[in-house]
Amino acid sequence: MRDFHLPGRSAVYGKNGMVATSNPLSSKVAIQILEAGGNAVDAAIAAAVLQGLLEPQMTGIGGDCFILLSPAGSEEIIALNGSGRAPAALNATDIRAAGHSIVPTGGVESITLPGAIDAFCKLSNDYGKLGLKSSLAPAIHYMKAGVPIAPRTAFDWSLAVDNLKGLARDFYLLKGKPPTAGQMFTAPMQAKVLEEIAQKGRDGFYKGEVAEDMVSSLNALGGVHSLDDFSNV
């Protein structure tokens, strides 16, 4: 219950687990995972992947992942760095030769290999209870069914329109315009990617058709990413 004697947020207490995300639907899904017998790892993966649909201007499965966790009944703290490296063929000499003194933040040179999916797979396998398929199921459902866009997300989205290039404009704009607050947004193609991962594990993302599509898109932008880079994440 809200403590009206104090300003700001009240302290929250719970016996079996807590969830905090920036979107109520992500929090709800994570709680449902816990109620279904999952643990914090299962719930965190479910919420994180769903966030890529609810707030794609902030996060997504093409990004990285950093985790601190403490296994139940242990005082040990485990850290996992789920960030990807730069492609093997990228070097500073070529970047300077192209006229850059720093890595251009808006260029293909700044795109590293996505490490989040590899981290999620390892986390689920090593520390989860329900399995990766269960953790990905909520995001797959909502990517097909759609979600209403929150006001703050719509505001951020409108500021990022000029950053969208090529096919990204088809996937992240609605009739050429950013979605407004309350509009439904779906990502059926991303749902297919998650289904591949649910079926094949990390190989569904870092090998085969999905990896080939990412490499092709990056190469078309001038990137030096390769299939070997992805398979070696």
Where are the regions a protein language model picked out?
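Noncatalytic scaffold domains of N-terminal-nucleophile
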Residues: 1-32, 40-207, 211-233
